[in-house]
A protein has these predicted regions:
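Domain-level recognition of soluble alpha/beta enzyme cores
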Residues: 123-158
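Conserved strand-to-helix beginnings and helix N-cap segments that scaffold or border functional pockets
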Residues: 90-91, 119
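Active-site-proximal alpha-helix that buttresses catalytic centers in soluble enzyme cores
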Residues: 2-82, 88, 95, 125-129, ...
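Short, small-residue-enriched loops and turns at beta-alpha junctions
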Residues: 86-87, 155
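A structural signal for short coil/turn segments at secondary-structure junctions
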Residues: 45, 70, 100-101, 141
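Short, flexible active-site-adjacent loop segments at beta-strand->alpha-helix junctions, enriched
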Residues: 11-12, 57, 84, 112-113, ...
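Non-DNA-binding regulatory cores of transcription-related proteins
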Residues: 99-133
Length: 166
């Protein structure tokens, strides 16, 4: 099995200008999106060797809520990764992969446009990762292949929870 990089965009957050950007919180809808993403990944049997999140409040909370649907061992693998706070390039975001076994999985929880740009850098494919959405890239050699792209509505359906019409 090839190494996999999974990406989870934070759930819907408070509007810009309500507080400092790094302090913006998830809305109730964003919290539901994060829980649904975690539940869907658990239902699909996806487990992670490492879970890295942006230190910004909305991304940290997304990671925590998603992980709340996983085993205790999975929850203990969460940690902040400063490059995910924004403006990174693939080498910076993927530096932590050295800690992951050759066939392992890492989950990156962060922001746009960085996550979609990362998918593009790795695969050459343009994607639109929605708030609360998930993508996965299978890495092989110097590039990768887009393996999964799920919108929040699809994640809610997989998780078996009501959708918010997104």
């Amino acid at each position: 099995m090839a190494r996999q990089v999974w990406l989870l965009r934070h759930g819907e957050a408070e509007p810009h200008g309500t507080r400092a950007d790094e302090e913006r919180r998830l809305t109730p809808r964003g919290e539901r999106q994060a829980r649904a993403a975690g539940a869907a990944l658990a239902r699909l049997g996806v487990a992670f060797d490492v879970v890295l999140f942006s230190p910004k409040v909305r991304a940290r909370r997304t990671a925590e809520l998603a992980a709340g649907e996983w085993s205790k061992a999975q929850r203990e693998r969460l940690r902040a990764h400063e490059p995910l706070a924004g403006g990174f390039h693939a080498p910076e975001a993927l530096a932590a992969l050295s800690e992951v076994p050759g066939d392992g999985r890492v989950l990156l929880v962060g922001h746009e446009p960085d996550l979609s740009s990362l998918v593009g850098e790795l695969t050459g494919s343009g994607v639109d990762l929605k708030k609360g959405g998930v993508a996965a890239v299978r890495l092989e050699g110097v590039g990768g292949e887009l393996a999964v792209l799920l919108r929040p509505r699809e994640l809610a359906l997989i998780a078996g929870v009501p959708t918010d019409g997104n």
